[in-house]
């Protein structure tokens, strides 16, 4: 797929208690899937179909065989197995590293496209939210570094206005470490009108 093209979108929300919801818009209608167990998603197929994939692959030993293509269904199956296979830890940096390893394993490789699958698109960035330490990690395919925002350093009061971290054209600005001081005043994001 190409940046700027219409595509299926799922939005994942989670909180510090481990609660989770997946929001998806199908034919302009919002559907919310709410369950603590919903820890993985891809933009396609519909989330109910992703749950069916989980049921199918849940019967297969993922240490012996997992699907390996760039198709969303295969990436979802890998991520679903791996998120439950990584070690659970109270060390937040180790936990973030483990989650990044799952996301990288399930990312669509750079430049891969399939003619009859226009929504198969390169993974351009990955994010991990650390609810415990209130850190938001970001990794761009263009950057050699993972960087993060310490949300405790951000003033979310309405009076401070909108701020953004300018990643530059195609996310080519390079950041390293904690970047809350690099945020600049900006205009609010404007959504394109629905067709």
Segments predicted by a language model, with ranges:
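C-terminus-biased signal that marks the final domain/tail of proteins
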Residues: 4-7, 16-18, 39-195
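Structured, non-membrane catalytic/scaffold regions adjacent to prosthetic-group chemistry
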Residues: 1-37
């Amino acid at each position: 797929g190409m940046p700027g093209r219409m595509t299926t979108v799922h939005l994942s929300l989670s909180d510090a208690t481990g609660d989770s919801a997946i929001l998806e818009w199908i034919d302009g209608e919002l559907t919310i899937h709410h369950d603590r167990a919903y820890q993985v998603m891809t933009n396609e197929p519909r989330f109910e179909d992703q749950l069916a994939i989980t049921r199918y692959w849940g019967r297969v030993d993922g240490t012996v065989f997992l699907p390996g293509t760039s198709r969303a269904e295969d990436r979802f199956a890998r991520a679903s197995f791996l998120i439950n296979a990584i070690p659970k830890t109270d060390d937040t940096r180790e936990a973030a590293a483990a989650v990044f390893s799952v996301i990288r394993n399930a990312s669509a490789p750079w430049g891969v496209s399939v003619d009859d699958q226009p929504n198969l698109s390169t993974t351009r960035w990955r994010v991990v939210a650390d609810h415990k330490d209130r850190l938001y990690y970001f990794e761009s395919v263009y950057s050699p570094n993972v960087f993060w925002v310490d949300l405790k350093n951000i003033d979310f009061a309405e009076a401070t206005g909108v701020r953004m971290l300018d990643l530059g054209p195609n996310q080519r600005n390079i950041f390293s470490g904690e970047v809350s001081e690099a945020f600049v005043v900006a205009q609010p994001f404007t959504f394109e009108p629905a067709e």
